[in-house]
Amino acid sequence: MRLLVRPEEEELERVLRRSEMDVTEVLPDVERIFEDVVERGDEALLEYTERFDGVKLEAEDLRVSEDDFEVARELVDERTVEALEEAAHRIEEFHRKTLPRVDRITFDVEGTECGLTLRPIPRVGCYVPGGRAAYPSTALMTVIPARVAGCREVVVCTPPADNDVRASPEVLVAVEIAGADAVYRVGGAQAIAALAAGTETVLRVDKIVGPGNVYVTAAKLLAYSRGLTDVDMPAGPSEVFVIADDSANPDWLARDLIAQAEHDPHAAAVLATDSEEIARAVKERVEELLDAGIEREEIVLKALDRNGWIVVLDSLEECVRLANRYAPEHLQLCVENPEELLQDVENAGAVFVGHLTAVPFGDYATGPNHVLPTGGFARARGALGTWDFVKIIPIQRLREGDVERLAPIVEELAEREGLPNHAEAVRARRS
């Protein structure tokens, strides 16, 4: 990790420029895959599954059967099943408590009846990635809020695997616990194309959520740009930004940075502090842990070499300002008085308050969602939640008195915008 002590703005810009996910490089390949799936459906899915995943399936294998779920249960350790069930309970409880509960509200706007109604998105597709590792926790984090929101059908796509159930057994158990209606053994851009356009087997959905690699992200953006389906957010490499003072534990901080770095060679791990002593202690501890040997060491080393920074600034207020510019996926406040800093936090996917609140607790068990904006998108949105699975529909009702009051406004503005028939539609209703 690189240490910067009271850096100049040019050096801070280097910290802010973490790895970005450039979909333009893969977009031509994704477009070809997309068109092929739209044109040939299941046949294309089976070919891409064999080519990219090395798993040969028949059409009837695309959808996971009830027997497969039973076998998956037998393959997964009971302690893992119990952990998934306990995590699911907490995730569901959190999302039920954050569910917008208003079915319809009406109110008066200058004498006119207006209002809102909330409706669940009918069909949702959840992408649960494979690749470097299987992520059953992502199945919980995507399926549960959709189900809590009242979506009529919730389906899952996850990459196939070469085993007895031809998918991650842990993911299948998690999906069953979460309550999805169907699971398909298909991953990558082809999975997104199938969910967006539908095939003989895969149900076409109204929205796609869940993280994935650059091909998955490009496919989601392509599906959205073509008006086929809505999507949640682009997903880039994972990142953590830690703010610490001299009350922090250097060993804990070092392990927190390493934990984030193990996600991906392009992951980012940044520590900002007002204590040079803490900064040097954390850097030394990271090096000690790496020298002693850790699991996933190659990934961690690449990530910390590319996007690992320890920054010493003059005050914690400056650290918060830098964090707001960074807009991290995960923000940890490892300081003596975290509430004082929390009120100034503007941009973060999720905030972890206090020395005890390590990011992995939020990844798995506290309850809030771990599908979060990366790459600076926390400037504009926060975590996935039940609000992502409902539509807010405005309602308005005019009565005769409203027509006379509003018609002059509408007629004037419609004429100015060159839409005379808008004005005529209103004039026809005047007494």
From Swiss-Prot:
EC number in record: 1.1.1.23
Binding site for Zn(2+): Q260, H263, D363, H422
Signal peptide: none
Keywords: Amino-acid biosynthesis, Histidine biosynthesis, Metal-binding, NAD, Oxidoreductase, Zinc
Binding site for NAD(+): Y127, Q190, N213
Single GO BP term: L-histidine biosynthetic process
Residues reported in the UniProt entry to bind substrate: S238, Q260, H263, H330, D363, E417, H422
Record field: catalytic activity: L-histidinol + 2 NAD(+) + H2O = L-histidine + 2 NADH + 3 H(+)
The keyword NADP is assigned to this record: no
InterPro entries: Ald_DH/histidinol_DH, Histidinol_DH_CS, Histidinol_DH_monofunct, Hstdl_DH
GO MF annotations, alphabetized: histidinol dehydrogenase activity; NAD binding; zinc ion binding
Pathway where this protein functions: Amino-acid biosynthesis; L-histidine biosynthesis; L-histidine from 5-phospho-alpha-D-ribose 1-diphosphate: step 9/9
The protein's role, per its UniProt record: Catalyzes the sequential NAD-dependent oxidations of L-histidinol to L-histidinaldehyde and then to L-histidine.
Full protein name: Histidinol dehydrogenase
Organism: Methanopyrus kandleri (strain AV19 / DSM 6324 / JCM 9639 / NBRC 100938)
Gene name as annotated: hisD
